[in-house]
Design a protein with these regions (language model features):
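Acidic, glycine-enriched catalytic cores built around paired aspartates
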Residues: 170-231
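Active-site capping/gating regions of soluble enzymes
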Residues: 3-166, 170, 174
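A broad detector of the eukaryotic-type serine/threonine protein kinase catalytic domain
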Residues: 1-2, 193
Length: 231
């Protein structure tokens, strides 16, 4: 139940923050709080269950992957770049998505391949699922779940086809994700299927907020710029 799980994630974050304060500490759910260290993620393991039978629609009676499984992966590959403002909602979120940092840089998919944006874990057929490794721990769980499941749903509805599974390193492939929040918002605004799915007014309002946040960030001159470019 994605809604119940989102409730649990929200409650967990609030609880951790409250306990930390009581111990005279601060807990952060920033995606990339420390330079040179891996960031903090919120990987989503997702599958689709038939409401009538309780069966995982990603596996058939013989235990093999179904067409719906591959359509779902293709939907993630197609629509997650435009959904990035929900998975990586802040300017800091994109610092986490770099090579050799236990975080993805593209939407290649592979079997038990942790260098890919989309990983298919080794599992029993009834537990067949896709791990979306893009979301950071700073993401709103309700929005991240809705965007990720929605992208997979669009792939199933449109019967999209995924790329071939990657057997090598995803870090050797080109970057295919927005590099910062401003680019991500532009992709979201251009993606009509996500607008139809999530609601035009909601997407327009959310994008406007994120554009404002990025503009405020962009006006700040960083210490790095002063150190290397001032003189």
């Amino acid at each position: 139940d994605p809604l119940a799980l989102a409730d649990q994630v929200f409650l967990f974050k609030r609880t951790i923050r409250e306990v930390a304060i009581r111990k005279n500490m601060y807990a952060t759910f920033m995606a990339k709080p420390m330079q040179g260290e891996p960031g903090s993620a919120m990987h989503l393991h997702q599958s689709v269950v038939d409401m009538a039978s309780g069966q995982n629609v990603f596996s058939n009676a013989q235990g093999e992957a179904t067409e719906a499984f591959f359509h779902h992966i293709a939907g993630l590959q197609t629509y997650l770049p435009a959904a990035m403002p929900f998975l990586a909602p802040f300017v800091n979120s994109y610092r986490r998505l770099s090579r050799f940092s236990a975080a993805p840089i593209n939407l290649e998919w592979g079997y038990d391949n942790r260098t890919c944006g989309l990983r298919v874990p080794q599992a029993h057929p009834q537990a067949r699922r896709v791990e979306n490794r893009l979301p950071g721990v700073d993401a709103n769980p309700y929005l991240a779940f809705a965007a990720s499941l929605g992208a997979g749903l669009l792939g199933m509805q449109q019967q999209l086809r995924p790329t071939e599974p990657l057997t090598g390193s995803g870090y050797s492939r080109p970057k295919k994700l927005p590099r910062h929040l401003d680019d991500a918002v532009e992709e979201l605004l251009a993606c009509t299927p996500l607008h139809d799915l999530l609601g035009h007014n909601f997407v327009k309002c959310y994008a406007a907020i994120k554009e404002t946040e990025f503009e405020e960030f962009f006006e700040v001159i960083s210490p790095w710029e002063r150190r290397y470019l001032l003189l």
